[in-house]
Regions:
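Acidic, serine/threonine- and proline-rich low-complexity regulatory regions
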Residues: 252-262, 297, 301, 366-381
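Conserved catalytic-loop position in the HRD/HxD motif
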Residues: 272
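An alpha-helical support segment within catalytic cores of ATP-dependent transferases
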Residues: 30-44, 210-268
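A generic "structured core" feature
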Residues: 111, 224-230, 238, 245, ...
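Conserved ATP-binding subdomain of kinase catalytic cores across diverse folds
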Residues: 1-212, 283-285, 289, 293-345, ...
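Hydrophobic residue at the +6 position relative to the catalytic HRD Asp in the kinase catalytic loop
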Residues: 278-280
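Structured alpha-helical bundle/scaffold domains in large eukaryotic membrane-trafficking regulators
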Residues: 183-186, 215, 219, 327-331, ...
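ATP/Mg2+ or Mg2+-diphosphate-binding catalytic cores
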Residues: 230, 333-334, 338, 342-376, ...
Length: 424
């Protein structure tokens, strides 16, 4: 017996795209598969995509990509919902525009997303890979010859000030487009006291769970590296202060602009934004992909309106990961790194500034309600979601890559320092 991945087979892809082109239905035993087109592509050939995707993705011809969802959940997948809304209701062009979709409608009236067809974007890879390569060049070549990381980065493509600012501007335009969509499930919602409490409880739960797992990891000799173990102890020591700040409402008072201008609006966001979700075109422009949200989160949570600060925090954490992973390569590959680690961490600090400069340069001129007005309140909001993301990363690394646990642990301590999370 020979087993193949049918979702990558040419016959399957051709059949599905034919059905989308013709708006065809396929009757099943307890429901019907329905396929609809928004201008599909014909005369395709199939090319598999080799990458770490949750779902099956193939390129059909040069202008169309077909994604088949492996994990089916009742309801419309946000990748289809958000992608279709951006395609049909906005002028935002920095996405893979949706060309068709496939759903399963059960006899019980429940609908499931099974596939989505988008345009295939000519690209040179995702931003994670491109930035990693650029940072490696930075510490190999630039760090030893140029005193300033920003000057060294100017010749390193994606780690240059211009590129990072343009990436920030792209995400700013994405949020403006999402905020403009007037459809059920989109639009804006105010941040209420219940919203603030929900954020606080979510962070406390995630942080408390991660701290418990860190304590367990420290009891396993050799499980964590010496550096990670040292950082883990510092995070555990900082946890009571953070917990007290959350319980006393210090963070809420900081974030709410002292009740003058609120915490901005809630909108539909990307939900799982990081450098791996950004493609870079050959001309240097960026394209945002994969609006599914965190795959393991419940559908209702992925579809819920959120603060745009959550997406921004995801990007900032991704910059941190890129810099720290480059630092690991610099100190472990045997090449003369010298001051490379310091240069990379300095670059990360600069990249935060460049990204936020590009982002708010786009947003502030077009919408004064997405974010709090005061810089201090914005920083508190971003820090909240950064530290929540970092605790999520701690759990992931302990379970999958304990050698990388030092990266999110360092991030937690850095965010606490910026936020003043040791206050009571």
């Amino acid at each position: 017996m020979v087993l193949i991945d049918a979702a990558s087979d040419g016959a399957y892809v051709s059949a599905v795209l034919d059905l989308m082109e013709s708006s065809g239905d396929v009757q099943a035993r307890h429901g019907v598969f329905q396929f609809r087109s928004i201008g599909a592509c014909r005369n395709w050939h199939v090319e598999n995509v080799s990458s770490e995707y949750t779902n099956s993705v193939v390129i059909a011809h040069r202008s169309s990509a077909l994604k088949t969802f492996r994990l089916l959940t009742a309801g419309i997948n946000p990748d289809v919902e958000v992608g279709s809304a951006l395609t049909q209701r906005t002028q935002f062009s920095e996405i893979a525009r949706v060309q068709g979709e496939g759903t399963y409608l059960g006899d019980d009236g429940v609908r499931y997303s099974v596939a989505v067809q988008t345009e295939a974007i000519p690209n040179v890879g995702d931003a994670w890979g491109a930035l990693g390569a650029a940072l490696d060049r930075l510490w190999r070549d630039g760090a030893s010859t140029v005193g300033s990381p920003s000057a060294a980065a100017s010749c390193c493509d994606l780690c240059s000030p211009d590129a990072v600012q343009r990436l920030g501007a792209t995400i700013g335009r994405l949020h403006l487009a999402l905020a403009s969509i007037d459809l059920p499930g989109f639009g804006r919602a105010p941040v209420t006291p219940d919203t603030l409490q929900g954020w606080r409880v979510r962070l406390a739960d995630r942080a408390g769970g991660a701290v418990g797992r860190l304590d367990d990891a420290l009891r396993r000799p050799g499980f964590l590296s010496d550096k990670a173990a040292r950082l883990a102890r510092l995070v555990i020591q900082a946890w009571p202060g953070l917990k007290s700040s959350l319980a006393s409402g210090v963070w809420e008072r900081d974030t709410a602009d002292a009740a003058h201008s609120g915490c901005g609006d809630l909108i539909r966001c990307h939900g799982d934004l990081h450098l791996g979700q950004i493609l870079q075109r050959p001309d240097g422009r960026f394209v945002v992909i994969d609006f599914e949200g965190e795959p393991l989160a419940p559908l209702a949570e992925r579809r819920a309106p959120a603060s745009p600060a959550r997406d921004v925090a995801g990007m900032l954490r991704s910059f941190s990961y890129a810099a720290h992973s480059a630092r690991l390569r610099a100190t472990s590959c045997g090449l003369p790194a010298d001051n490379a680690p310091d240069v990379l961490l300095h670059w990360e600090r600069l990249a935060r500034h460049w990204f936020l400069q590009g982002y708010f340069g786009e947003v502030d001129g077009a919408d004064g309600h997405l974010w709090p007005a005061l810089p201090e309140a914005r920083q508190s909001l971003v820090c909240l979601f950064e530290i929540e993301k970092a605790f999520y990363e701690v759990d992931y690394e302990i379970n999958n890559r304990p050698d990388w646990a030092a990266i999110p642990l360092s991030g937690i301590l850095q965010v606490l320092e910026r936020w003043g999370g040791d206050r009571t």
